[in-house]
Amino acid sequence: MRFPGATHRVITCKSVAEAKAAVDTARRILKQLGVELHPQKTRITHVQEGFEFLGYKIKRGQRQMHLPESMIRSQARQGALYAYPKEKSIRRFMDQVRQRTKRTLPLKTEELIPELNPLLRGWGEYYKRVHVRQLFNRLDRWILRRIWSHRFKRWRKAGWRWLPRRKLYGEYGLVRLAGLIPSLAF
């Protein structure tokens, strides 16, 4: 019996022995339910190496502290867990944006943006709660260049000055990925 998507789990343990015992226990319980663990997808790894899960890369990072060791009261950030989109997810998103902003598409900018917005909003909403501020800013700039490039190809005399950012985000309603991050609402 298969339950796609219903059995995605991450189990954290303090030691390798504890992790192996947890996998054995999970196998026994799932066998009673008529379900089995996928041998290629089930693995034990150290969080320092990181792992990929549901489109995210999760890893323990060593955050650079700008204060001397004596001034740091808490070591909570030294070994913090960081999650960010997988490279494959980012590439797939960029490919979808490329498909919708092809320079040969016979669309005006006002027609192109409503085609692009659902993709931007959906992808941005899924990843907005992890460490993506720099990534979203970079992707926002890249999307602007794609739109400007599309417009310039269609109308050679219309340079980027004729289509400023405030017009794209304001009048045309282009979704800004960085604006989806809760602490950065524009």
Please give the residue ranges for each predicted region:
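Non-catalytic terminal/accessory segments
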Residues: 1-186
